[in-house]
C-alpha cells in the first residue's frame, strides 16, 4: 500500500490551508508556522535555508531593496518612485515644513464647545481641545495600554491590519498583533485603525464627547427597532506603532471625526474641502499610481497639526486628512454625521460613490440615516410652526439638501440602486412632498423676520440722516445686484452658518460709499443685509405697514379674498400722501444717475437700449425702491421667489397683484435651490425670465399714484428726456411686450380692451388709415405711401369693395380717440424701433393725453361704433373666420401650414394685430431693415408675370409696359420697408412702416376680415378689373383657375385659398 508523503520537521502530510516554504539547500518543504516564517515575509527572502541547513549553508539571505515601491520584486534595474508609507517616504515627510495649523484650527476649552456655539459659528474648521475636562467624555486611566485592549475586546477577534510600507491590509487576530506590538524586533510597520468596540466590554469605559452624542444622527434619530442595523462607527480604537502612516482620505459618508490621544502623539495633515481641492482629490484617488504621489504637493496649502497626549481634535465634514504617528500611540476616535454640514456630507458621499473605493472604516447605510433624519426634520418643522417659532437657518438648508437627495434617489432610473437602504414602512413620496411644504413655510417666515430686522434698523437711524437724493448713485444701484437670501448658507465650505443672526445694530454704518466695494466674500451676507436698509425711505411707517401686510398673508393663507382687499387698502393709504410727488421726482433722478453710472463702466449695453430702458424705470422704481423689498410668488407648480412683486394668474392668494419683471441680467441660480412640485410659496432670489407672460393686472395704488402727479390739463408734451408720469409709456407699463394687448384690472380705472380682430384686408386698411377722400387733422398721421395705396386699392378690387369712406371713415376717428384713452406700447424688440427715425423731427405731432377718467368712458363708446361699422364690411364666404380666443402661441391655422415648413420667413399670421400706435420718443432706428416675405413675394410675382406675358401676350403692346412697372413697384416697396426715415415723397406713416417690418399691433375690432397681401397694381373697382381682364385677353379661352383677376393674382402671388401667403 502506498504511503502518504510527509513534510517539514513535524512530519505531517501536506495541508492546503497552511503556508509552506521550500529550502533551497535540501529541497524539502516546511510549514511557515513551524520554522517561524510569515507568509508576508516570504517574497522578501532571496535564499531560504531551513533550520537544519543553516548549520552547514548559513542563514537565509534577503533581497536587496533597490526602490521603495510596493510593486518592486528586486529583479528590475530601474528606480521607481518612492512609495507612500515607505521608510524613505516617512523620512522625507518628517523633514518637510508645512504651514502651521494656527490659521485654520480653532482652539477652545471643553466647556466652550457647546451646541449653541456651533449653531452660531458653524462647524467648518477643525477644533482643538487641550484637555478633556468639560467635554463630557469618558476615557480609561493613563495606565490603560494595548494589553488591556486585548483583555476587554478578546484575543481571538479578527482585526484589519495595515502594512504601512505597502499600504495594503490583511486580517490578523488581535492576540497576534499585540504580540507584534510588544516585540523588540519589528520587521514591518503594522497599524490597526478600525477596531470598532461599541458592542464589546470596553464600550463601558470609553464614552464619546457629549457634543458628538447631541449632534449624531445615528445616536438620536435611528430607531432601536429598525430592521436595518445602526452603523457601527461611533467608537474606534487605534493602535499605531512608530512611523505608521495613513494616506490622504475623506471619511466615509462625509462624516466628521473626533480623535483623543490616550498615549503617544499623532500628526495630522489637513486640507480644506474647497471645490478645487475636492476635484483634485477625486482625480488623484482615481489614478492607478496614487500611492506614488504625495497629494499635498497638488494643492495650495496643507496644514500640519500635532495632537499630543490628552488632547482632543474635531475634524469637520469633508476635510482631506492624512495621519502620521511619530511614536507608538494608543488613541480613540469616532465618526458622526450631523445637521451642521449636510451639504458637505452629501458632496463627500457622492465623491465616495463615484470613486468606489473600499474603506476600512465604512459608514454603512448612510442613506438610511438620511431618511430617518428627513422624517425627524418634518416632525420638527411641524412642531415649530405650530408653536409659531422659526427653525434655525442651518436646519432649513440641511432639509433642502436632504430632500433634494431623496428626489434623486427615488427616480425611476436610480431606484434599484438605492431601494436597499430605504427604511421599512417609509413612504418616500409623501415624505418628500410634506417636507418640501414645511421648508417653504420656514423660508417665508425667515424672510419676514429678516425684513422686520431691516425695518428696526431703519427706524434706529438718526433723524438728521441725509435725504435719499444726496446719497451717491452707487448706494442706490446696489439693490439691483443679485442678493442671496439670508437663510441659505453658502454652497462653498466657508462658514455657511456664521454671521446670520447677529449684526443688525451695525446696519446704519453700511452706507459709507468708499467701503462698500471692499467687502470681502466672507462678509457678503452682512453687507447685503445692510444694503437693504439703505433704500431711500422717508417714512419707515410705510415699510412697516407693507411688512405687516405680508406677515398677515403668511398667517392667513386660507383667506385670499380678504387679504387682497386689506393689502390693496394698505397700499392705497401708503401712496396717497401729499409729499409723494417730491419723492417720485427724486427716485426718478436716482434711476437716471444709476443707469448712467452702471453702464458707463460695464459698457454692456448700447445707448439706444439704455434710453428705452429709462422709459420704464420710473414705474418700476415705485415698487422696487419705495417700500417693497420682498414679495412672494407662485408659478404653475414650480415654486420660485423674487425680490420684486411677481405673481402668476393662477395664484389664489395674490391674484390681483401685477407681475412686474426686472430688466437686468440674471445671475446663475443657487446650485442647491429647491423647486417644488406644488404651487406653494417660496422666495426666489433671482427670478427667471419667461417667454410667455401671464395676463397682467394693474395695482389700484398705482393709478392713485398717477393722479396726484399728472396735471389736469396739459396742452402739449415737453420734449425732455425724462418722461412725465402721464405719458403713454407710463400707462403702457402693464401691456405685454409679446403683442398681447389684453389688459385686465379689477381695481384699475382703465377699461378692459376686448381684443382686436384677426387681421384681414380691412385690418390692413385700418392699420394704414388710408381710404380715398379722408381728411386728416393736424393731430393725425399722414396718409400712406403711394405704393401702399395702390396695393390697398388692388385688394379692394379683389374683395369687390368700392374705395369709399363707408367702412373706414368712422374707424379712423375712433382710432384717434382710442389713442387718447388706450396706450398701446410699441414692441421692445429692435425690429420695432425703426419707426423712431422720423419721430425726432416732428415731436409736435404727438397727441396730447386725456385723463384716465374720461378715457375710460370714451373708449367704450368708440368701441361700440367700431363693432357696428366693421360688421357692415364685406366677408369672404370661402374664408373661415377664427374666433378672438386664439393666441399667438396656439394659432388656429396651425394645422393648415403643413405644405411649407422649411421656409426662411414666417408666413403672414391672420391673428397678428396690426394697428396705429403713438410714436415713442427717441427710439433707435434700424438701418437697412428688410422683410423677406414682401420682397420675395413681389419679386416672384414680377418675374412670373413678365415671363407669362412675354410668351403668351407678345402681340399686345401693353404687356411690354407691365414689366418695368412691376419691377419699379417692387423696388419701391422694398426700399420703403428698409429705409429708417420717411422721405417727403413717400409720406409713409407709422402704421405702414410697422406692417412692413412685422411689429405692428391691431387696434380695436371684433370681426376678422379676409387676409390679404400687398399688391403692386392699383385696381379702383371691381368693374374696372373685369374690363381690364377682358381687354388683355379678348379672344382666348382662359385656363382653369385663371378666369378672374382674383384667381390670377392668387396664382401669381401664391395665395393659398385659406388666406396664407406661401413663399
Swiss-Prot record:
Pfam families: JHD, JmjC, PHD
Bias kind Polar residues: ranges: 776-791
Biased composition (Basic residues): 746-755, 842-852, 953-964
Documented EC number(s): 1.14.11.-
Coiled-coil residue windows: none
Region (Disordered): 448-546, 704-761, 773-864, 879-1045
Matching PANTHER family: PHD/F-BOX CONTAINING PROTEIN (PTHR23123)
UniProt similarity note: Belongs to the JHDM1 histone demethylase family. JHDM1D subfamily.
Protein's job: Lysine demethylase that demethylates both histones and non-histone proteins. Mediates demethylation of dimethylated 'Lys-9' of histone H3 (H3K9me2). Recruited to trimethylated 'Lys-4' of histone H3 (H3K4me3) at rDNA promoters and promotes expression of rDNA.
Protein name (Swiss-Prot/TrEMBL): Lysine-specific demethylase phf2
Lineage start: Eukaryota, Metazoa, Chordata, Craniata, Vertebrata
Amino acid at each position: 500500500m502506498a504511503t502518504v508523503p510527509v513534510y517539514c520537521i513535524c512530519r505531517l502530510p501536506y495541508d492546503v490551508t497552511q503556508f509552506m516554504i521550500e529550502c533551497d539547500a535540501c529541497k524539502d518543504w516546511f510549514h511557515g508556522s513551524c520554522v517561524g516564517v510569515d507568509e508576508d515575509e516570504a517574497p522578501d527572502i532571496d535564499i531560504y535555508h531551513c533550520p537544519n541547513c543553516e548549520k552547514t549553508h548559513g542563514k537565509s539571505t534577503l533581497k536587496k531593496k533597490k526602490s521603495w515601491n510596493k510593486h518592486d520584486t528586486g529583479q528590475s534595474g530601474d528606480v521607481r518612485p518612492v512609495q507612500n508609507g515607505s521608510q524613505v517616504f516617512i523620512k522625507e515627510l518628517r523633514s518637510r515644513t508645512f504651514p502651521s495649523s494656527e490659521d485654520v484650527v480653532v482652539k477652545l476649552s471643553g466647556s466652550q464647545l457647546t451646541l449653541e456655539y456651533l449653531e452660531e459659528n458653524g462647524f467648518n474648521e477643525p477644533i482643538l481641545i487641550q484637555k478633556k475636562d468639560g467635554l463630557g467624555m469618558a476615557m480609561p486611566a493613563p495606565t490603560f495600554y494595548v494589553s488591556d485592549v486585548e483583555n476587554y475586546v478578546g484575543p481571538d477577534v479578527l482585526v484589519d491590519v495595515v502594512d504601512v510600507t505597502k499600504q495594503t491590509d490583511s486580517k490578523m487576530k488581535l492576540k497576534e498583533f499585540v504580540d507584534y506590538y510588544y516585540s523588540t524586533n519589528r520587521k514591518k510597520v503594522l497599524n490597526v485603525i478600525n477596531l470598532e468596540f461599541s458592542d464589546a466590554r470596553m464600550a463601558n469605559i470609553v464614552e464619546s464627547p457629549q457634543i458628538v452624542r447631541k449632534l449624531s444622527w445615528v445616536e438620536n434619530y435611528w430607531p432601536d427597532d429598525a430592521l436595518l442595523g445602526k452603523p457601527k462607527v461611533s467608537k474606534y480604537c487605534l493602535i499605531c506603532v512608530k512611523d505608521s502612516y495613513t494616506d490622504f482620505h475623506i471619511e466615509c459618508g462625509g462624516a466628521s471625526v473626533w480623535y483623543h490621544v490616550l498615549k503617544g502623539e499623532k500628526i495630522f495633515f489637513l486640507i480644506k474641502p474647497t471645490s478645487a481641492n475636492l476635484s483634485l482629490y477625486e482625480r488623484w484617488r482615481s489614478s492607478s499610481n496614487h500611492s506614488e504621489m504625495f497629494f499635498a504637493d497638488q494643492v495650495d496649502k496643507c496644514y500640519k497639526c500635532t495632537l499630543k497626549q490628552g488632547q482632543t481634535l474635531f475634524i469637520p465634514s469633508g476635510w482631506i486628512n492624512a495621519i502620521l504617528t511619530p511614536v507608538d500611540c494608543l488613541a480613540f476616535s469616532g465618526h458622526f454625521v450631523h445637521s451642521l454640514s449636510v451639504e458637505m456630507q452629501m458632496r463627500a458621499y457622492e465623491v465616495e460613490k463615484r470613486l468606489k473605493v473600499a474603506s476600512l472604516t465604512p459608514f454603512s447605510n448612510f442613506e438610511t440615516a438620511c431618511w430617518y433624519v428627513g422624517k425627524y426634520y418634518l416632525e420638527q418643522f411641524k412642531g415649530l410652526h405650530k408653536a409659531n417659532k422659526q427653525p434655525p437657518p442651518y436646519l432649513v438648508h440641511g432639509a433642502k439638501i436632504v430632500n433634494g437627495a431623496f428626489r434623486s434617489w427615488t427616480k425611476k432610473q436610480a431606484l434599484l440602486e438605492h431601494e436597499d437602504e430605504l427604511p421599512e414602512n417609509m413612504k418616500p413620496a409623501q415624505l418628500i412632498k410634506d417636507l418640501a411644504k414645511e421648508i417653504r413655510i420656514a423660508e417665508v417666515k425667515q424672510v419676514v423676520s429678516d425684513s422686520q430686522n431691516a425695518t428696526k434698523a431703519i427706524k434706529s437711524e438718526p433723524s438728521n440722516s441725509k435725504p435719499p437724493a444726496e446719497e451717491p448713485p452707487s448706494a442706490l444701484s446696489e439693490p439691483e445686484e443679485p442678493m442671496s437670501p439670508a437663510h441659505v448658507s453658502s454652497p462653498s465650505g466657508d462658514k455657511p452658518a456664521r454671521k446670520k443672526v447677529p449684526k443688525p445694530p451695525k446696519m446704519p454704518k453700511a452706507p459709507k460709499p468708499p467701503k462698500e466695494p471692499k467687502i470681502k466674500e466672507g462678509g457678503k451676507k452682512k453687507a447685503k443685509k445692510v444694503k437693504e436698509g439703505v433704500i431711500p425711505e422717508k417714512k419707515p411707517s410705510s415699510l412697516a405697514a407693507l411688512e405687516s401686510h405680508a406677515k398677515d398673508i403668511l398667517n392667513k393663507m386660507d383667506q385670499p379674498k380678504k387679504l387682497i382687499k386689506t393689502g390693496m387698502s394698505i397700499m392705497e393709504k401708503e401712496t396717497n400722501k401729499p409729499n409723494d410727488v417730491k419723492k417720485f421726482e427724486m427716485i426718478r433722478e436716482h434711476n437716471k444717475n444709476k443707469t448712467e453710472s452702471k453702464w458707463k463702466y460695464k459698457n454692456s449695453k448700447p445707448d439706444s437700449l439704455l434710453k428705452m430702458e429709462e422709459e420704464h424705470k420710473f414705474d418700476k422704481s415705485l415698487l422696487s425702491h419705495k417700500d417693497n423689498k420682498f414679495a412672494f410668488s407662485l408659478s404653475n407648480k414650480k415654486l420660485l421667489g423674487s425680490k420684486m412683486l411677481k405673481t402668476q394668474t393662477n395664484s389664489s392668494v395674490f391674484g390681483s397683484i401685477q407681475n412686474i419683471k426686472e430688466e437686468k441680467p440674471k445671475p446663475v441660480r443657487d446650485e442647491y435651490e429647491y423647486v417644488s412640485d406644488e404651487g406653494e410659496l417660496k422666495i426666489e432670489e433671482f427670478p427667471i425670465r419667461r417667454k410667455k407672460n401671464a395676463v397682467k393686472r394693474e395695482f389700484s395704488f398705482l393709478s392713485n399714484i398717477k393722479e396726484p402727479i399728472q396735471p389736469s390739463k396739459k396742452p402739449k408734451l415737453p420734449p425732455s428726456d425724462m418722461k412725465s408720469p402721464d405719458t403713454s409709456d407710463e400707462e403702457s407699463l402693464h401691456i405685454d411686450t409679446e403683442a398681447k394687448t389684453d389688459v385686465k384690472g379689477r381695481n384699475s380705472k382703465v377699461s378692459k380692451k376686448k381684443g382686436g380682430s384677426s387681421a384681414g384686408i380691412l385690418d390692413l386698411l385700418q392699420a394704414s388709415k388710408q381710404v380715398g377722400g379722408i381728411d386728416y387733422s393736424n393731430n393725425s398721421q399722414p396718409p400712406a405711401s403711394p405704393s401702399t395705396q395702390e396695393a390697398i386699392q388692388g385688394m379692394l378690387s379683389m374683395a369687390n369693395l368700392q374705395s369709399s369712406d363707408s367702412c373706414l371713415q368712422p374707424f379712423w376717428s375712433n382710432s384717434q380717440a382710442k389713442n387718447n384713452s388706450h396706450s398701446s406700447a410699441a414692441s421692445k424688440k429692435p425690429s420695432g424701433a425703426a419707426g423712431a427715425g422720423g419721430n425726432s423731427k416732428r415731436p409736435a405731432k404727438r397727441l396730447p393725453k386725456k385723463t384716465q377718467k374720461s378715457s375710460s368712458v370714451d373708449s367704450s363708446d368708440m368701441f361700440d361704433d367700431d363693432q357696428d361699422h366693421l360688421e357692415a364690411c364685406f366677408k369672404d364666404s370661402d374664408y373661415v373666420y377664427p374666433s378672438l380666443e386664439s393666441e399667438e402661441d396656439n394659432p388656429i391655422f396651425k394645422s393648415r401650414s403643413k405644405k411649407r415648413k422649411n421656409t426662411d420667413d414666417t408666413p403672414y399670421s391672420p391673428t397678428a394685430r396690426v394697428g396705429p400706435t403713438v410714436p415713442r420718443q427717441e427710439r433707435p432706428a434700424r438701418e437697412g431693415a428688410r422683410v423677406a416675405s414682401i420682397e420675395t413675394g413681389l419679386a416672384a410675382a414680377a418675374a412670373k408675370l413678365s415671363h407669362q406675358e412675354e410668351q403668351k401676350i407678345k402681340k399686345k403692346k401693353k404687356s411690354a409696359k407691365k414689366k418695368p412697372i412691376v419691377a419699379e413697384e417692387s423696388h419701391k416697396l422694398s426700399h420703403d420697408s428698409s429705409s429708417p426715415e420717411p422721405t417727403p415723397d413717400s409720406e409713409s406713416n407709422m402704421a405702414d412702416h410697422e406692417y412692413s417690418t412685422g411689429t405692428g399691433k391691431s387696434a380695436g375690432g371684433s370681426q376678422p376680415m379676409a387676409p390679404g397681401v400687398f399688391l403692386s397694381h392699383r385696381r379702383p373697382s371691381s368693374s374696372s378689373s373685369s374690363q381690364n381682364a377682358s381687354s388683355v385677353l379678348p379672344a382666348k379661352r382662359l385656363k382653369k383657375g385663371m378666369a378672374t383677376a382674383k384667381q390670377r393674382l392668387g396664382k401669381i402671388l401664391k395665395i393659398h385659398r385659406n388666406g396664407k401667403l406661401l413663399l
